[in-house]
């Protein structure tokens, strides 16, 4: 069973760990229980959470038992950031977010009655019952303020606007989670992003001091692209959310299909379960035939199916093909069509608004001016609903609107925009 570490190594998924030999020996001795925690600081998890989530799944597939911990308590405090205090949410809001995130967590690991069946916990169940006196005596007594002040994030905050005691104490709450999971489930390994190393190691020490047990810590790398930009940010700069109401399956798919050649093979290693042989073939295809974007299509398909399911992936792929003239637009359901167009640009068309094709091209941003629009039409570079427009006097008829209110405009091969008729 220790081969899980070899698997993680070749995928580049181990950033730091405590005693590697001891961890390997314990993994080889039999099934291990491990956990990773996820704080409900928003209504949904985002793409940045995928690495630790999928690492839990890899351990489960290797015969170990994962615990997914929803941070109903720690989410009310917030891990210190480099700049600024977090806005404290109400208990009801955090509880609602924790329930939503718990549902998302359950998609990534298998829950059954087997020895490797996953467990879901919420740290509010033990932290909420902890009195101030108990917290200070049973947890705080084991922590040196000098060590806590030496954390990079804390040090940067102290050099700036300072840090509240609330956020300063976050490390203690997370460390106590490890103690509780060790006592309840025999948990012996915590995994998380490399920015959590200090908190995780604090838990390892607290388990040793309070229970006399040796447990382990391992972190995964924080994912950036080849230009050093943070992974999982949408084109608008916001997070790429797992909740389809916050990031549509179409937007999710498009993010991954637009992955740079320099990043796609690494992303396939980190975010999919493809074997080395197939990854090698995709790496070769990217090197020798980059214009085909074979690896990007596989990445987008794998991750959309993982997060949203096979039906959503099929709908998204049909939408992508139809938008770019390789499928039937009328066959798309309206939610999929609307979501796809909103990832491009949508202009509204009112009953009194100008509806000449040149006006629509300018309104959607596909042309800089009516003159430019006329030139593009004359060159045969404009289509509406995948039908080429030959006249700059063209106006839409009622029958042209998909689902009674949508037009799909395209300039050239890849520039797409939408027009939405409003009444």
From Swiss-Prot:
It is an enzyme of class 6 (ligase). GO terms for molecular function: ATP binding; RNA binding; tyrosine-tRNA ligase activity. GO terms for biological process: tyrosyl-tRNA aminoacylation. Keywords: Aminoacyl-tRNA synthetase, ATP-binding, Cytoplasm, Ligase, Nucleotide-binding, Protein biosynthesis, RNA-binding. It comes from the Bacteria. Its EC number is 6.1.1.1. Its main location: cytoplasm. A motif ('HIGH' region) lies at residues 40-49. Residues 355-412 form the S4 RNA-binding domain. L-tyrosine binds at residues 35, 170, 174. A motif ('KMSKS' region) lies at residues 230-234. It is found in: Cytoplasm. Catalyzes the attachment of tyrosine to tRNA(Tyr) in a two-step reaction: tyrosine is first activated by ATP to form Tyr-AMP and then transferred to the acceptor end of tRNA(Tyr). Belongs to the class-I aminoacyl-tRNA synthetase family. TyrS type 1 subfamily. This is Tyrosine--tRNA ligase. It comes from Mycobacterium sp. (strain JLS). The gene is tyrS.
């Amino acid at each position: 069973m220790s081969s899980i570490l070899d698997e993680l190594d070749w995928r580049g998924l181990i950033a730091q760990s405590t005693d590697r030999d001891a961890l390997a020996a314990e993994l080889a001795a039999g099934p291990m229980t491990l956990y990773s925690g996820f704080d409900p600081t928003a209504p949904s998890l985002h793409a940045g959470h995928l690495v630790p989530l999928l690492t839990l799944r890899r351990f489960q597939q290797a015969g170990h038992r994962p615990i997914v911990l929803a941070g109903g308590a720690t989410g009310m405090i917030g891990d210190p950031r480099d700049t600024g205090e977090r806005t404290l949410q109400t208990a009801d809001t955090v509880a609602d977010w924790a329930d939503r995130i718990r549902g998302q967590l359950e998609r990534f690991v298998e829950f059954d009655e087997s020895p490797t069946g996953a467990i879901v916990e919420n740290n509010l169940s033990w932290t909420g019952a902890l009195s101030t006196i108990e917290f200070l005596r049973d947890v705080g007594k084991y922590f040196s303020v000098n060590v806590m002040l030496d954390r990079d994030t804390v040090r940067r905050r102290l050099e700036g606007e300072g840090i509240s005691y609330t956020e300063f104490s976050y490390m203690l709450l997370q460390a106590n989670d490890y103690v509780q999971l060790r006592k309840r489930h025999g948990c012996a390994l915590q995994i998380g992003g490399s920015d959590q190393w200090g908190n995780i190691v604090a838990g390892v020490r607290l388990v040793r001091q309070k229970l006399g047990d040796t447990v382990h810590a391992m972190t995964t790398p924080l994912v950036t692209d080849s230009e050093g930009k943070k992974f999982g940010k949408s084109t608008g700069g916001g997070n790429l959310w797992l909740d389809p109401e916050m990031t549509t399956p179409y937007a999710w798919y498009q993010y991954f299909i637009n992955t740079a050649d320099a990043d796609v093979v690494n992303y396939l290693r980190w975010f999919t379960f493809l074997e080395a042989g197939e990854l090698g073939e995709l790496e070769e295809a990217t090197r020798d035939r980059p214009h085909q974007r074979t690896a990007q299509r596989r990445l987008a398909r794998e991750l959309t199916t993982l997060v949203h399911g096979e039906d959503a992936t099929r709908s998204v792929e049909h939408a992508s093909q139809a938008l770019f003239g390789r499928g039937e637009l009328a066959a798309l359901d309206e939610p999929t069509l609307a979501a796809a167009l909103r990832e491009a640009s949508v202009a509204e068309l009112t009953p009194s608004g100008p509806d000449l094709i040149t006006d629509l091209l300018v309104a959607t941003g596909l042309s800089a001016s009516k003159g430019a629009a006329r030139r593009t039409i004359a060159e045969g570079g404009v289509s509406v609903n995948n039908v080429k427009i030959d006249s700059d006097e063209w106006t839409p008829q009622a029958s042209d609107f998909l689902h009674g209110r949508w037009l799909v405009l395209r300039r050239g091969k890849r520039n797409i925009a939408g027009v939405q008729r409003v009444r």
